[in-house]
């Protein structure tokens, strides 16, 4: 088996849908998924030997580029000493220190293996801290696939056009209230009615799983104000944006813009593990100390804080200094400008939105995308045409119009030229669909 089609067929025989995460199956764009054999810097190679400029970057973790030598070397050294111990290691403390140094409101950190575990634990912790049950989330915000948070979620749920998931009992979401994103008045109304029952509001610091939809000025600060007034906690999900948008995530960008607020709990993932399976939650010591073994809120995991992932995380954060983010911001603007020029030349109606170096394009939309309903109004068929034209020209984009595009510190001039050359034909393909 050497072709992507043969590999996909074989995978479908033994793995549901042939993939281990739904968006990888190309369900919304059609065609055969590329089976990746290797990755280096800004490039990936599929099973047929075709090279692509990668704008997925492992869905975010590859901040420094694929297979950054220093990170690979650190993991190899760690692996030579043992893959996992089920016991504490010094690199857990080193990585916790690195997170605390970057995130001023965080005083203690607990490591888990996935973003879903991080948000699931954060919700349990908030309920344990407040003695309340109700959780408020926002439509289109994705917080992993735990039952309580799958209501009106983004990411793969949005890609599949699903309201939630089969197998989630009504009782699991009975205490979940979904509010339109960027609607302070709606959130205020929920607190006016049920404020004494709400344990926490959970929000993506900047949603990037319904496309990139930045919070309007003051929105996250309003969440902080309302939760404080009603004795609830604020959980800020930076699984995707943490250490990606800036050294302090999207929260750091908001601090720079003068929005001074501090959530009770953050969740982190992706970049913090340097490409290895690792996530975390962190926050005020009085809240975090409610976790077992010091408190009554239980959480555990055989591979939580495993040495390979923590070593990769430590090395990644060591290398991701301020200059890396400055280069990424400049590079992202250059690539966005080129994308805009191609779409303008083709007469495509679109909206391009970014959060620091993260960005995504909404085709067929001519006004700001500020919530999930706006995001769903984009022309998904136009994105499909655009996606395949780019793929045929050697550019790997997210196989869903609801996902963010990622660059890395390794995306160089050669990668940019491949991207630039692919754009005109892809833009024309999108234009033809929109005008049909």
From Swiss-Prot:
Molecular functions (GO terms): glutamate-1-semialdehyde 2,1-aminomutase activity; pyridoxal phosphate binding; transaminase activity
Catalytic activity, as annotated: (S)-4-amino-5-oxopentanoate = 5-aminolevulinate
Top-level lineage group: Bacteria
Pathway listed: Porphyrin-containing compound metabolism; protoporphyrin-IX biosynthesis; 5-aminolevulinate from L-glutamyl-tRNA(Glu): step 2/2
One Pfam family in the UniProt entry: Aminotran_3
Modified residues (N6-(pyridoxal phosphate)lysine): 270
Localization (cell): Cytoplasm
EC number(s) stated in the UniProt entry for this protein: 5.4.3.8
GO biological process: protoporphyrinogen IX biosynthetic process
Keyword Membrane: no
GO CC entries: cytoplasm
Xref: NCBIfam families: hemL, PRK00062.1
Entries under HAMAP family matching the protein: HemL_aminotrans_3 (MF_00375)
Family that this chain belongs to: Belongs to the class-III pyridoxal-phosphate-dependent aminotransferase family. HemL subfamily.
Name this polypeptide is given: Glutamate-1-semialdehyde 2,1-aminomutase
């Amino acid at each position: 088996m050497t072709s992507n089609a043969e590999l996909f067929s074989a995978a479908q025989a033994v793995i549901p849908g042939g993939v281990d995460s739904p968006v990888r199956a190309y369900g919304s764009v059609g065609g055969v998924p590329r089976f990746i054999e290797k990755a280096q810097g800004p490039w990936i190679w599929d099973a047929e030997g075709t090279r692509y400029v990668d704008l997925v970057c492992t869905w975010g973790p590859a901040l420094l580029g694929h297979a950054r030598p220093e990170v690979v070397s650190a993991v190899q050294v760690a692996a030579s000493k043992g893959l996992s111990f089920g016991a504490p290691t010094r690199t857990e403390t080193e990585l916790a220190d690195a997170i605390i140094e970057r995130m001023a409101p965080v005083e203690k950190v607990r490591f888990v293996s996935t973003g879903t575990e991080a948000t699931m634990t954060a919700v349990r912790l908030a309920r344990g801290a407040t003695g309340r049950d109700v959780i408020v989330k926002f439509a289109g915000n994705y917080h992993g696939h735990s039952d309580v948070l799958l209501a009106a979620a983004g990411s793969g749920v949005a890609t599949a056009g699903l309201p939630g998931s089969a197998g989630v009992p009504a009782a699991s979401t009975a205490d979940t209230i979904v509010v339109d994103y960027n609607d302070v008045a709606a959130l205020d109304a929920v607190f006016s009615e049920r404020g004494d029952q709400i344990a926490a509001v959970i929000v993506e610091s900047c949603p990037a799983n319904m496309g990139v939809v930045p919070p309007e000025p003051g929105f996250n600060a309003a969440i902080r104000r309302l939760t404080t007034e009603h004795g609830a906690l604020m959980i800020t999900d930076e699984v995707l944006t943490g250490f990606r948008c800036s050294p302090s995530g999207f929260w750091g960008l908001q601090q720079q813009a003068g929005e001074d607020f501090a959530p009770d709990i953050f969740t982190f993932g992706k970049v913090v593990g340097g490409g290895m399976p690792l996530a975390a939650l962190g926050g005020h010591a009085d809240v975090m100390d409610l976790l077992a073994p010091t408190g009554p809120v239980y959480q555990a995991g055989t591979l939580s804080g495993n040495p390979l992932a923590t070593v990769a995380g430590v090395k990644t954060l060591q290398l991701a200094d301020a200059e890396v983010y400055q280069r990424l911001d400049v590079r992202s603007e250059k690539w966005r400008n080129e994308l805009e020029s191609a779409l303008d030349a083709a007469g495509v109606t679109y909206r391009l939105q970014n959060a620091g170096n993260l960005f995504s394009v909404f085709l067929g939309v001519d006004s700001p995308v500020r919530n999930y309903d706006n995001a769903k109004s984009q022309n998904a068929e136009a994105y499909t045409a655009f996606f395949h034209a780019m793929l045929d020209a050697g550019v790997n984009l997210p196989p869903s119009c609801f996902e963010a595009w990622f660059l890395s510190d390794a995306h160089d001039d050669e990668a940019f030229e491949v991207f630039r050359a692919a754009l005109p034909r892809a833009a024309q393909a999108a234009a033809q669909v929109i005008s049909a």
